[in-house]
Amino acid sequence: MKIQAPKGTKDVLPEESYIWQYVESKFRQICKLYGYQEVRFPTFEYTELFQRGVGETTDIVQKEMYTFLDKGGRSITLRPEGTASVARLFIEHGFASRPMPQRLYYIISAFRYENTQGGRYREFHQFGIENFGSKSPVTDAEIISLSYNFFVSLGLDNIVVNINSIGCPVCRKDYVKNLKEYFLGYYDKLCPTCKQRLDKNPMRILDCKEDNCKLIAQDAPKPIEYLCDECKTHFEALKGYLDAAGVCYKVDPYIVRGLDYYTRTVFEIVDVVLDKELAICGGGRYDNLIEQIGGSSTPGIGFAIGVERLIMLLSQKGLIPQKPQVPQVFIATLGDLATKKAFEIASTLRFEGISTVIEELSRSLKSQMKYADKLGCDFAVIIGDDELEKGVCKVREMKTSSEEVVRIEGLAQHIKSKI
């Protein structure tokens, strides 16, 4: 057996984990600024939750979920996305009785069996936002503004928000009827999957990635042309709020998103380079989802950001920050007494917020210095019997190799003055 990670998964090594910590920190910061609180939930759920929540006709449910029977014979699925799980959490823990709206965010791994290309993985990571309890277009604008400003905070300056409205269940009936009639005229040219979608949910055809289906869909009826007065008013108000917030957006009448729970507002955020768009965020409103999976009627809206794709984009654009210096100090020891003292000194330095490691392998001083250099430490503190007797240590600046003799009790302040 070859020892390696399964196809479609990826290890995050120390030389890149700081990038993940950086974007996670930025996301937590923006969530805090907008008043959102973190939730955490299981990696797996009962399969029925995703069948009812995500939609039986979606590619996710039909083709991509990791589903198995547990030892009790229950059908379990590794979460393919976060919204359905947060909706279940909302119902199970009685969030409907809490002050509305409820603003929640999460950072998760998710799982889908799909082609591994262009920043896509079978285990991937998402940042997500869910807002429950408000139908107002103000909430839609806030959600979009949050995601937009998150990307701006990372230095992305070519991002555009593509927005659309797919209407409510009332006005969507006429749209779906006309859409079905349109695609029936091209039935023989549709891919096998879209032929099945035609009866169950013809809107899914608009989301098909097959070239022929994409070509046919270009002239299909647009959901925005069938909006009822209430949905039109909602969408116009959203555009006004986005204008007021200074968010760069355009209307894309063919965005429908790949999940069945969406209503009214749907959006994608893309990075534009040489007229090519890379989607880095997607979301929308889902006013019927909570009721659909067994809760009381509660409007909601949210989005998800693909972390792997985001990091890939930041790397391509040179927006990755410099790796922080960890550890800052290496304590080299000569002898058992020095090693014991090194523990004491290391504890003091760490208490002062200075990242410190000590020698553990009883190597020669030369080997220890080579190790400190490979770690990229700023300083090496050298302690031997002679230094212990005098209550001092040698502090070597690794970049210049210059050394100073410093009293041990003043070491922390000395190093802090140099950092």
UniProtKB/Swiss-Prot annotation:
SUPFAM superfamilies named in the record: Class II aaRS ABD-related (SSF52954), Class II aaRS and biotin synthetases (SSF55681)
GO cellular component: cytoplasm
UniProt xrefs under Gene3D superfamilies: Anticodon-binding domain (3.40.50.800), Bira Bifunctional Protein, Domain 2 (3.30.930.10)
Disulfide bond found in the keyword field: no
Catalytic reaction equation(s): tRNA(His) + L-histidine + ATP = L-histidyl-tRNA(His) + AMP + diphosphate + H(+)
Source superkingdom: Bacteria
One GO process term, biological-process aspect: histidyl-tRNA aminoacylation
Family annotation (InterPro entries): aa-tRNA-synth_II, aa-tRNA-synth_II/BPL/LPL, Anticodon-bd, Anticodon-bd_dom_sf, His-tRNA-ligase, HisRS-like_core, HisRS/HisZ, HisRS_anticodon
Alphabetized UniProt keyword annotations: Aminoacyl-tRNA synthetase, ATP-binding, Cytoplasm, Ligase, Nucleotide-binding, Protein biosynthesis
Localization per Swiss-Prot or TrEMBL: Cytoplasm
EC number: 6.1.1.21
GO molecular function: ATP binding; catalytic activity, acting on a protein; histidine-tRNA ligase activity; transferase activity
Assembly notes: Homodimer.
Family statement drawn from the similarity comment of this UniProt entry: Belongs to the class-II aminoacyl-tRNA synthetase family.
Protein name: Histidine--tRNA ligase
Source organism (scientific name): Caldicellulosiruptor saccharolyticus (strain ATCC 43494 / DSM 8903 / Tp8T 6331)
Name of the gene: hisS
